[in-house]
């Protein structure tokens, strides 16, 4: 995780593997930084396939619902509210009703409406579900004040960050130098340890050590447990079509 105060709180993490590309260089730097905090040698591996960017694009769509979807969600509340201006419907109900493809975007739309003080969320007694209350039910959907420019700018920044992460993966210069310059450090030195700096050495082939072989077997065992048997063979539940 790239969240502060969460994840593995150990200083002796020796190995960090990214099975898919993170959404930004900032996220990658924070996540990879979990390794070797005790100052000893540690290794970070990023398994990259451009097709994996679709996962991050899905997340970007989920946190950037757009003004049109926000208005659709608000109109749903106007249509469904009871005499107390309350709606006792789940996020899945809302998603199905307005024809949204990304359920995450419904939650993001609710967040925007709450920050604008158009709605509030409340606990439903005797249930773990939450309801929604209209705070200004007299306001029609067409009269909602939504900063569309700010929404568009945030989505643009999110997509730009993903593109920068892709550029890092394709870069033919020192990875550490690239990252440091991304964060504004000028004339950053090369690390001498990344795959680019190692050059031809990184392409040499050799038999794995016993310890490396054990790691590979454990890794493949985990992949197998995330698969299921079908009529035509084994099919991955997660990471389908990925190169590992």
Predicted regions, residues:
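C-terminal helicase lobe
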Residues: 2-4, 8-244
């Amino acid at each position: 995780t790239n969240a502060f105060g969460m994840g593995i709180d150990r200083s002796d993490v020796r190995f960090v593997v990214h099975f898919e590309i993170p959404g930004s260089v900032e996220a990658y730097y924070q996540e990879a930084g979990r390794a070797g905090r005790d100052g000893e040698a540690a290794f970070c591996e990023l398994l990259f396939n451009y097709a994996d960017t679709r996962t991050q694009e899905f997340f970007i769509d989920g946190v950037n619902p757009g003004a049109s979807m926000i208005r659709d969600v608000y109109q749903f509340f106007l249509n469904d509210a009871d005499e107390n201006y309350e709606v006792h419907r789940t996020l899945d109900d809302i998603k199905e009703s307005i024809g949204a493809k990304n359920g995450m975007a419904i939650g993001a739309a609710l967040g925007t409406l709450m920050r604008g003080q158009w709605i509030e969320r409340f606990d439903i007694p005797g249930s773990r579900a939450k309801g929604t209350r209209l705070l200004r039910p007299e306001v029609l959907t067409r009269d909602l004040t939504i900063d569309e420019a700010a929404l568009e700018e945030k989505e643009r920044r999110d997509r730009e960050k993903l593109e920068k992460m892709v550029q890092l993966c394709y870069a033919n210069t020192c990875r550490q130098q690239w990252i440091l310059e991304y964060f504004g450090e000028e004339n950053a030195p090369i690390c001498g340890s990344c795959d680019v700096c190692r050059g031809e050495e990184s392409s040499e082939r050799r038999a794995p050590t016993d310890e490396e072989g054990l790691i590979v077997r454990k890794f493949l065992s985990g992949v197998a447990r995330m698969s299921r048997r079908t009529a035509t063979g084994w099919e991955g539940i997660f990471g389908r079509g990925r190169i590992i």
